[in-house]
Amino acid sequence: WYSSMFAANIKQEPISHHHHHHHAHHSHHADSNSNASSPHQSPLPSPNPPSNTNLQLEQYLKQQQQQQQQHQQQQQPMDTLCAAAMTPSPSNNDQNSPLMWSGLPNPMQTIMPANMRPSPTAATAATTTELCAPTTTTAAIALQANDKLQALTPPMDVTPPKSPAKSQQSCAEPEKEHDLMSNSSEDMKYMA
């Protein structure tokens, strides 16, 4: 998904680079301070996206990277859709991102952990809704699946490395909680 997102950005970047070039240049100094709240800096309809898009995109990317490591197939369809739907926002802001990173490091560092700690799902869902409304349903489904998968991941990780007897003990309780898991992990243990 990473490469698809960047490929899409790179394809669009030369286009937006040309008609953005002078604009970005002459507003570099004027807007470097007020950039977060300057609507004309960004071609997007609403005044917020220049800061929100990058801020939330950063959150979104970090979360996607974490989730991706755990279950790639689950993530793939959503990433592709979101990358396609989101590409216009990040790529239009690409020229501005140097300003953004310098203008926003503090809000980003404070807001991100705050948002991600209490409920990553809510943060991602909000981000997804704002950045690519069409894929909200897909995102919501994938997020629910992610939650299940993340809940099921620990027993899964425990089962294969240990001997069948040990893994049966260590997994007995999680299996009671996770009906979905119990069938497959018991099969694995008895097969092993």
From Swiss-Prot:
Main localization category: nucleus
Q: Does the keyword Metal-binding apply?
A: yes
The molecular function GO annotations come to: DNA binding; zinc ion binding
Q: Where is the composition biased (Basic residues)?
A: 17-28
Q: Name one GO biological process term.
A: segmentation
Region entry Disordered: which residue ranges?
A: 16-54, 152-192
User: Which UniProt keyword terms apply here?
Assistant: Developmental protein, DNA-binding, Gap protein, Metal-binding, Nucleus, Repeat, Zinc, Zinc-finger
Biased composition range(s): Low complexity:
32-41
Q: What do the Gene Ontology cellular component annotations say?
A: nucleus
User: Where in or outside the cell is it found?
Assistant: Nucleus
Q: Where is the composition biased (Basic and acidic residues)?
A: 173-192
Q: Which domain of life is it from?
A: Eukaryota
Task: Outline what the protein does.
Answer: Gap class segmentation protein that controls development of head structures.
Q: Which family does it belong to?
A: Belongs to the hunchback C2H2-type zinc-finger protein family.
Q: What is this protein called?
A: Protein hunchback
Q: Please tell me the species this chain comes from.
A: Drosophila tanythrix (Fruit fly)
Q: Which gene encodes it?
A: hb
